[in-house]
């Protein structure tokens, strides 16, 4: 996500200097709807609600959310001047205006092409899992994705990258089993998980 913010900020500065407001707005809208709403917020809400306050994962999530909020306020300030000012006055300890702030100059270490490419592939796997889950939902076999138990078959290339990734969290599923297959495409088998879903979840 930091890599995405880094590259988006570079594109924003370029589009802003060239008065290319259409592309500027389009990239910001895509970031908010696809990267944040449909992905990051979806997989991180349980961390915020359920993990202890001292959890390192929860702390890093909060830190990133603050970076995202600060970035979005500055990016949207030229477009949504009154809205961003109201939010800025609510969250900022400074008495200045958002329109007096400088755009953030993110450190080069935020750029990580290898990690970005890895996560692009992981999201590809997640999309295949979501498609399989939606088919079960359409057939009324499951309700929430948390009622799903997944078996994923990956080719050799994709199988290498799943280590250190909690696919149950990534796919918001009850459990996930992964095995290596010989086929090029991703295969996903979705079944109704055993046990009962938490009523709070």
What does each model-identified segment do?
Residues 1-13, 41-132, 139-154, 177-188:
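Acidic, turn-prone loop/beta-hairpin segments
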Residues 16-23:
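Short helix-adjacent coil turns
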Residues 25, 29:
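Aromatic-lined ligand-binding clefts that engage carbohydrates, nucleic acids, or primary amines
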Residues 32-33:
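Hydrophobic residues within the alpha-helices of tandem HEAT/HEAT-like
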Residues 164-178:
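A glycine-rich helix N-cap at a beta->alpha junction
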Residues 187-195:
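Short, flexible, mixed-charge glycine/proline-rich loop motifs
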Residues 198-201:
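Short cysteine-rich clusters marking metal-coordination/redox-active sites
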């Amino acid at each position: 996500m930091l890599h995405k913010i880094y590259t988006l900020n570079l594109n924003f500065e370029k589009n802003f200097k060239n008065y290319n407001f259409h592309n500027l707005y389009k990239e910001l809208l895509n970031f908010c709807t696809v990267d944040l709403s449909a992905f990051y917020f979806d997989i991180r809400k349980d961390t915020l609600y359920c993990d202890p306050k001292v959890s390192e994962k929860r702390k890093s999530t909060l830190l990133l959310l603050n970076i995202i909020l600060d970035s979005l306020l500055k990016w949207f300030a030229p477009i949504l001047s009154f809205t961003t000012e109201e939010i800025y006055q609510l969250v900022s300890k400074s008495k200045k205006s958002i329109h007096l702030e400088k755009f953030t100059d993110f450190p080069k270490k935020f750029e990580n092409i290898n990690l970005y490419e890895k996560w692009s592939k992981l999201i590809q796997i997640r999309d295949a899992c979501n498609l399989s889950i939606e088919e079960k939902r359409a057939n009324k076999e499951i309700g929430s994705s948390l009622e799903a138990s997944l078996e994923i078959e990956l080719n050799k290339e994709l199988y290498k990258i799943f280590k250190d990734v909690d696919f149950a969290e990534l796919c918001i599923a009850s459990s996930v089993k992964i095995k290596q297959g010989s086929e090029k495409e991703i295969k996903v088998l979705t079944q109704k998980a055993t046990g009962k879903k938490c009523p709070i979840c």
